[in-house]
Design a protein with these regions (language model features):
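Residue-level recognition of pore/gate-forming positions within transmembrane alpha-helices
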Residues: 1, 82, 177-181, 226
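Short loop-to-helix capping motifs
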Residues: 1, 68-71, 167-169
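Transmembrane helix-loop junctions in multipass membrane proteins, especially transporters and channels
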Residues: 8-12, 98-110, 168, 188-196, ...
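Hydrophobic core positions of alpha-helical segments in small-molecule transporters
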Residues: 76-77, 172-176, 221
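Central hydrophobic cores of alpha-helical transmembrane segments
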Residues: 169-183, 201
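Helix-loop-helix units of permease transmembrane domains in multi-pass membrane transporters
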Residues: 52-85
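Junction motif at the cytosolic side of a transmembrane helix
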Residues: 161, 165, 223-243
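Secretory targeting signals
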Residues: 2-51, 80-156, 160, 201-222
Length: 243
């Protein structure tokens, strides 16, 4: 609501060079409220279900599953549900914001020549598939909502894997938030120029807030997050095997 009130409503007229596609929260990088939302995405993604494995161990349900030899089915179903919950929690605020922008701001295609499209060049790397951004802007938004869904789900998966090592629900919730902060800080030190290209959350934006976007980097980061989750869950399952 603050984003709509402060960063959308005052600039809703077409004379300001904005349309839905350039001012919604996923595509506009000049807002502190959007920055705060993306900062909290790892925490929000973990809250719905990432602590389920820990809760099931504490209640004894996980031990019951083990005695029934249903461990693989348990983890398969848990990961899918946790991934879906984390992804939905990530894109739900973005979808609501997009809908509100459609109610207030003109539905006009971005114009590379006439409008200030906030550093989205046709041949640059501020976003993936820039030609789609100009020719089919709504499709471009839907594509990045899908990417944001995947990023949120994968981060929730990492938190789920960490719940096999942690004994406190709150620590499970904040674990990925802390790890993501430390990771971004480390990458920022190692790669002083273009560090944001290697941040997973960069690809939850339609337009990169800093640096550039690379499709190969995004795919690699997603594979790494999935790999970390699988290794962590296997390690945790081994650690909590019944004697």
């Amino acid at each position: 609501m603050l984003y709509i009130a402060k960063d959308v409503y005052p600039y809703r007229a077409l004379k300001y060079g904005h349309s839905v596609y350039t001012i919604w929260m996923g595509g506009f990088n000049g807002s502190i409220y959007a920055s705060l939302f993306y900062l909290l995405v790892p925490l929000l993604a973990a809250i719905p279900m990432a602590d389920t494995w820990l809760s099931d161990r504490q209640s004894g349900y996980y031990q019951f599953v083990q005695t029934r030899n249903k461990t693989k089915q348990y983890f398969r179903g848990l990961y899918v549900c946790n991934f879906t919950a984390g992804g939905l929690v990530t894109i739900f605020p973005l979808a609501i914001n997009l809908y509100a922008c459609f109610l207030l701001v003109p539905d006009e295609k971005p114009d590379l020549i006439l409008w200030d499209t906030h550093t989205v060049s046709l041949y640059g790397k501020e976003t993936l598939f820039p030609s789609v951004f100009y020719d089919y802007p709504l499709l471009h938004i839907c594509l990045f909502l899908f990417f944001a869904f995947c990023i949120g789900g994968l981060l929730a998966g990492v938190a789920l894997a960490l719940s096999g090592l942690l004994k406190n629900i709150f620590m499970v919730w904040v674990s990925v938030f802390v790890l993501n902060y430390l990771y971004e800080s480390l990458v920022g030190i190692v790669c002083k120029n273009g560090a944001a290209t290697y941040y997973p959350l960069t690809y939850a934006h339609q337009v990169a807030p800093l640096g550039e976007m690379e499709l190969s980097v995004m795919v690699t980061l997603m594979i790494l997050l999935l790999g970390i989750t699988i290794i962590g869950m296997c390690w945790g399952a081994k650690r909590h095997e019944l004697d």
